C-alpha cells in the first residue's frame, strides 16, 4: 500500500502523487544513483527513469505488479543509460530521451523536445523540459498532478546543482535554473538522479555559514536510511541550495573572499558561475 509524500518529509520509497505512483530506487552503487519507476495506478503500466541498476528496477516492478513499457533517459552519461539494454531485453520497452541525444544513446526510439507529453498508462502525463547545462541534451520530466513533481536527473540535486564537465556548459545551467526551475511552484517535489545531499549541504554551509535551515537539515539527515530518503520540495531548496541563493549577503561575502577581484556590483549569473567553479573542486 502506498503512502503519500507530504512536502519536505520522509515517506516510504513508494509515493502517490495525485494520479501517478512514484518508486524511488536507491541503488547503493558508487555513483549513489537513484533510479525511478513512475506507474499509472489504473493500468499498472510504468516508465523507468535512468534505470542503471536494471535488475533492481525489474524486480521492483514485478513486486508491485507493474509492467515497464518505456524508459526515459534524462541524458546520455553511462550511469544513466547503462541499464537500458537489460530493461529492453526483458520487457520490450521503448527508449525516450532528448531529441539531440539520438547519436549518443544506443537504440533510442523517440526524441523529445520541450513541451512534449510523455503518457504512462491511462492517467499519467509528464511534461518534457529541455534543461541544458549538465549536458546540452538533458531532459527533466515535470508532473503537474495534484502534488507537482520534478524528475531532475543531473540538473538539480538536493541542495546542489549538476556539474558541467561532461559535455555541458555552466552558462546554460544558470539559464535553466533562472528561466525554468526557479519559476516552478514551491510545492514541487524534487526527485534527483543521485544522493549527494550531505556533501551539498556541507558546501552550502561553507558558502553561507549562517544558513540555519541547512544546518538543521544536515543534522537531521546525516545518518538517514537512503532507502527511505528525504524528498525535498522547491521551497526548501530555495532555503538550503546555494545555487538558488544568489542574492544572499553571506554567499556574496564569502565569494569575495574566494575571488577578491570581483566587481562591486554582482549579477546573479556571475554569482552562480563562481559558485559552480568552486563546487567543481569541492
Which residue ranges define each predicted feature?
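Active-site-adjacent loop/tail segments of enzyme domains
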Residues: 160-187
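Active-site-flanking alpha-helical
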Residues: 82-83, 139-141, 161, 201
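Core dinuclear metal-dependent hydrolase active-site scaffold
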Residues: 37, 117-145, 180-183
Amino acid at each position: 500500500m502506498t503512502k503519500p509524500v507530504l512536502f519536505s518529509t520522509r515517506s516510504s520509497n513508494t509515493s502517490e502523487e495525485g494520479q501517478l505512483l512514484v518508486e524511488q530506487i536507491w541503488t547503493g552503487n558508487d555513483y549513489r544513483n537513484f533510479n525511478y519507476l513512475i506507474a499509472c495506478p489504473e493500468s499498472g503500466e510504468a516508465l523507468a527513469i535512468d534505470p542503471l541498476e536494471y535488475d533492481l528496477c525489474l524486480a521492483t516492478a514485478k513486486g508491485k505488479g507493474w509492467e515497464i513499457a518505456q524508459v526515459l533517459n534524462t541524458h546520455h552519461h553511462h550511469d544513466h543509460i547503462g541499464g537500458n539494454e537489460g530493461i529492453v531485453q526483458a520487457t520490450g520497452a521503448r527508449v525516450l530521451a532528448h531529441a539531440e541525444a539520438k547519436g549518443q544513446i544506443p537504440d533510442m526510439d523517440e526524441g523529445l523536445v520541450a513541451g512534449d507529453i510523455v503518457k504512462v498508462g491511462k492517467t499519467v502525463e509528464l511534461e518534457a523540459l529541455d534543461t541544458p547545462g549538465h549536458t546540452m541534451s538533458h531532459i527533466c520530466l515535470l508532473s503537474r498532478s495534484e502534488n507537482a513533481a520534478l524528475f531532475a536527473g543531473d540538473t538539480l540535486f538536493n541542495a546542489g546543482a549538476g556539474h558541467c564537465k561532461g559535455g555541458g556548459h555552466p552558462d546554460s545551467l544558470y539559464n535553466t535554473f533562472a528561466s525554468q526551475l526557479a519559476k516552478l511552484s514551491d510545492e514541487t517535489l524534487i526527485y534527483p538522479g543521485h544522493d549527494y545531499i550531505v556533501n551539498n549541504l556541507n558546501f552550502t554551509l561553507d558558502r553561507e555559514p549562517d544558513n540555519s535551515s541547512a544546518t538543521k537539515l544536515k543534522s537531521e539527515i546525516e545518518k538517514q536510511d537512503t532507502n527511505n530518503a528525504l524528498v525535498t520540495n522547491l521551497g526548501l531548496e530555495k532555503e538550503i541550495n546555494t545555487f538558488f541563493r544568489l542574492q544572499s549577503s553571506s554567499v556574496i561575502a564569502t565569494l569575495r573572499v574566494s575571488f577578491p577581484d570581483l566587481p562591486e556590483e554582482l549579477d546573479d549569473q556571475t554569482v552562480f558561475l563562481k559558485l559552480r567553479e568552486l563546487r567543481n573542486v569541492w
